[in-house]
Amino acid sequence: GRARQGSTRAPHMVGGGVVHGPKPRNYAKKVNKKVRRLALRSALAQKISEGNVIVLDDFALETPKTKTFIDFAKTLNFDGVKQLYVTNDDTDTVDRDYFLYLSTRNIEKVAAINTRDLSVYWLIKQDKVVLTKEALATIEEVLA
C-alpha cells in the first residue's frame, strides 16, 4: 500500500532523487613551475631533434584570408600535416597575429597561438611547429 512511504522524493519512489548522484569535482593537478618549464623544454627539444621546428623571420599576412595562408603553407610543404604557428605577443604585431588567427581558424589541422599560450599539450598535439624569430627569443628567455 501507500502507508509509511515517507517523502515522494525518496530514492525508492518513482520520480524520487538519485542516491549517490554525480558531484562537481576539480580534476586540476598542480604542477610546479620548474617542472612545467622542464616539460616544455624537453618537448621542444624533442621537436627540434626530430626536425619538426621551423624558424621564420615573420608570417607576413597583409590581409586575413584563408586562401593566402593555404598558399603560404604549401610553400612550406605542409599539406595534410598538423601545424602549430607560434608568434610573439608584442603590441607591435597584434594586427598581423590577429590576421594569422583569422586566416587559420577555419583550417582543420592548423593552430595559431602566442608564446604565452604555448604548452606541452600544443607541442605534442601538432606535428610541425613554425616559430617567428621573436617568438623563439621569448621562449628562450622563459626557458633559460
Give each language-model segment a name.
Residues 21-144:
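Extended polybasic, low-complexity segments that bind anionic RNA or targeting/receptor surfaces
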Residues 2-20:
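Glycine/serine-rich anion-binding loops at beta->alpha junctions
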